[in-house]
Each structure stands twice: as structure tokens, then as C-alpha cells.
């Protein structure tokens, strides 16, 4: 009797599971319309926060902006908004309500823009979306941004939702890791992943005693990215862009408190307490060996690279430590330059940039002509997400 039941359960189990690896089937991105040029930002920032008397600090901030390798960013908060909400401009004034009122509405809205583009590229009816993962470090609410997006897009009420709040900058890797497991464990699953970030939670005036907060003001930008994932694509209508081969997460040794964020009455405060680029570059080879050893790859220049651009120093030190050729981080640096650090959304923007450039330049695959690639997320913990990707022949994607 028991055997009969076991066989039955086994059969049900097999029917429930997909056969092949998860594929990225579409990517969409969106930003607010308000564009901020980095060259003009120090003047604007010190003027709008009534801090022009802090001339030494402004010089420091100018240097941070010059060294950031960022040309422009997009920000939802405008001068008008800041004039109406002066507490958001102060360094430490109770302003959580004003910030929440904005992000609770705008985070799902920006997410909808990115998701609509991804759904359009995918070309399938949105009723086929079975799972939704929504990720943001910008504001918290109940029911969450996942619920709001379900309503905004008109997804089925039975869509299975996962809401990730307050993960931080590594979460672009986290969402892919979770989406991979969902797609591969559920036959026919189509997972919509949305990362939407709006800096209204972290924006604040300068402080002499907290230069780490100023680093955030020089780097962070707004953006949302969406991807659709599924296993066993229907090649008559779906076009795979990348395959997800494996995904790992680890906490780096001796890195407690290296990056912290705290949600307070003053908004989300950002703290950098240790040498983050040093900690990441020191440990990155271990993550690569663990991920690529089983595949027999040890030449890091043979991979295409998607790394969360926390800041230019992280990219510089990783390149140096691994002996990477300059062009390896091209897509990563391009996104940093054009958008700044958009937290969890960055790596998905970089995936989009890479597949577009690869096709434009007539490369053989979506991964700059290469077969294997790596996607890295870095953030509070220090937490590192490592995703192994395989590209798709360019002919497939047309």
C-alpha cells in the first residue's frame, strides 16, 4: 500500500517539475523622467539643502562626484517636492511620513513601467504569469508593492507573490536565485521579477560628521528593472536571452557592519563602516572558484561580467585582483555612468545593456560572444550573490 502511494506521489512530483534550466525570456527597464547631471549636482544639492555655507564639505562632495564615474542619474524627487517637504532636505529631521507617502505610490508605479516593457518583449498574455517577485529597498507597506503591482498590471489574483523589502544592493542576484528555483520547480511557471528603487528614502542634506551618508548622495539613482523567467521555453513564441545555471549566496568573513542601513524617523540612513572594495576584492576569487570549479572554468577573462556597480572603487579593485581586461566591465561601467547606483535594479539594467550591445555589434551570443558569464550582487552583510549564466546564440533572439 505504502509503495503504491509513494509511486503516486513520485509521479505527481515529476509532473510538477520543469525539465530544463531557467531562462531569462525578456528584460524591461524604466526611470523617472527627471534627469540629474553629475557635473551640476554638487551646486544643486548644497543649494537645495540650504548648506552652501559648508564650503569645505561641498568641495569634498564635488570630488566624490567627480570620482564617481557617473555622468547622470534619474531622480523622482524634484526641486518642487523638496521645497514642499523641507524636512527631507535636513540631515536629521523627522520625515519618514513624507518619504513613505511618495515611495509607496511611486515604487510600484515605476515597477509597472519596467514590467510592461518586459511583458511586451515576451509577447505572451500576462495571464500566463504564475509568480511575481517584487524587490525594493525604498519604503515598506501592507499589502505590499507586490500587491499594488498585481493590481496596476491586472495580473491574475491567483498569481503567487513574494515581496522582498530592505535587502539592499545585492538583491538583483537574490531575485534571480529565487526566480530560478521557482521556474525550475514548477512546470509551466512564468516568473515576473521586478526591482524598483527610488532614492527618496535615503536623500538627505550633508553632515560634517557623517561622510558615508554623503557617499550615498553622490552615488544613488532611481530606476526599475523587470525580467520574465521560465524553464522549457516554447521556442515558437518565446526567445531566451540567458540561462541561469547556478546561484549562490554567502556572507563575507570579518565584514560585519561594513554596510548598514537603518529605517528611522529621518528615513533610511546609510552607513559605510569598513573598506568595502577591499573586502569584496579579497573574497571574490573564492566565490568564482566555487561557482565555476564544477564547470572546469578558471580563466576569469573567458567570462562575460555583470557586477553590481556599488561604486567605481569596487570595480577597479575587482579588476585588479582578478587581472580582468578593461573591456570585461564595459556594460557594468556603462550602466554606472548612465544611471548611478540603483541598488537591486543595477544588474538587471546591465543584463539589458549587454544583450542589446551584443546583438548591435553582431556578436555570436547575447553574452558579448562568450558562452559563460557571472552576475554578482554585493550589499549589506557583506552579502555576495553569485549567479552563473550561460548566453544564447544571437540568432535565437531575433
From Swiss-Prot:
UniProt catalytic activity: (E)-4-coumaroyl-CoA + 3 malonyl-CoA + 3 H(+) = 2',4,4',6'-tetrahydroxychalcone + 3 CO2 + 4 CoA
CDD domains: CHS_like (cd00831)
GO biological process: flavonoid biosynthetic process; polyketide biosynthetic process
Residues at the catalytic site: 169
One Pfam family named in its UniProt record: Chal_sti_synt_C
Pathway(s) it belongs to: Secondary metabolite biosynthesis; flavonoid biosynthesis
Record-stated family: Belongs to the thiolase-like superfamily. Chalcone/stilbene synthases family.
Name the record gives this protein: Chalcone synthase
Source organism per UniProt: Petroselinum crispum (Parsley)
Amino acid at each position: 500500500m505504502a509503495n503504491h502511494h509513494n509511486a503516486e506521489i513520485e509521479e505527481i512530483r515529476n509532473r510538477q517539475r520543469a525539465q530544463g534550466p531557467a531562462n531569462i525570456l525578456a528584460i524591461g527597464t524604466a526611470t523617472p523622467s527627471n534627469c540629474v547631471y553629475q557635473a551640476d549636482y554638487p551646486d544643486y544639492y548644497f543649494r537645495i539643502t540650504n548648506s552652501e555655507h559648508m564650503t569645505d564639505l561641498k568641495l569634498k562632495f564635488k570630488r566624490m562626484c567627480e570620482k564617481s564615474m557617473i555622468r547622470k542619474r534619474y531622480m523622482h524627487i524634484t526641486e518642487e517636492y523638496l521645497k514642499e517637504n523641507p524636512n527631507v532636505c535636513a540631515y536629521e529631521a523627522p520625515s519618514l511620513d513624507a518619504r513613505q507617502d511618495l515611495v509607496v505610490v511611486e515604487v510600484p508605479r515605476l515597477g509597472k513601467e519596467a514590467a510592461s516593457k518586459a511583458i511586451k518583449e515576451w509577447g505572451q498574455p500576462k495571464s500566463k504569469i504564475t509568480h511575481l517577485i517584487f524587490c525594493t529597498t525604498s519604503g515598506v507597506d501592507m499589502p505590499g508593492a507586490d500587491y499594488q503591482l498585481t493590481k496596476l498590471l491586472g495580473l491574475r489574483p491567483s498569481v503567487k507573490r513574494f515581496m522582498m523589502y530592505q535587502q539592499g544592493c545585492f538583491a538583483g542576484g537574490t531575485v534571480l536565485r529565487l526566480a530560478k528555483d521557482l521556474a525550475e520547480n514548477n512546470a509551466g511557471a512564468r516568473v515576473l521579477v521586478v526591482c524598483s528603487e527610488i532614492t527618496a528614502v535615503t536623500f538627505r542634506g550633508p553632515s560634517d560628521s557623517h561622510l558615508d551618508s554623503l557617499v550615498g548622495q553622490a552615488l544613488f539613482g532611481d530606476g526599475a528593472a523587470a525580467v520574465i523567467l521560465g524553464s522549457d521555453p516554447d521556442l515558437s513564441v518565446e526567445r531566451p536571452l540567458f540561462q541561469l545555471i547556478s546561484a549562490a549566496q554567502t556572507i563575507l568573513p570579518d565584514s560585519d557592519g561594513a554596510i548598514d542601513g537603518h529605517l528611522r524617523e529621518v528615513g533610511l540612513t546609510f552607513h559605510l563602516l569598513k573598506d568595502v572594495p577591499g573586502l569584496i576584492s579579497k573574497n571574490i576569487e573564492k566565490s568564482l572558484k566555487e561557482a565555476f570549479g564544477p564547470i572546469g572554468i578558471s580563466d576569469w577573462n573567458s567570462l562575460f561580467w555583470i557586477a553590481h556597480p556599488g561604486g567605481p572603487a569596487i570595480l577597479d579593485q575587482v579588476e585588479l585582483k582578478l587581472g580582468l581586461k578593461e573591456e570585461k566591465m564595459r556594460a557594468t561601467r556603462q550602466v554606472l555612468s548612465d544611471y548611478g547606483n540603483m541598488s537591486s535594479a543595477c544588474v538587471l539594467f546591465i543584463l539589458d545593456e549587454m544583450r542589446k550591445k551584443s546583438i548591435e555589434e553582431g556578436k555570436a551570443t547575447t553574452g558579448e560572444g562568450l558562452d559563460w558569464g557571472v552576475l554578482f550582487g554585493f550589499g549589506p552583510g557583506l552579502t555576495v550573490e553569485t549567479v552563473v549564466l550561460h548566453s544564447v546564440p544571437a540568432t535565437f533572439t531575433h
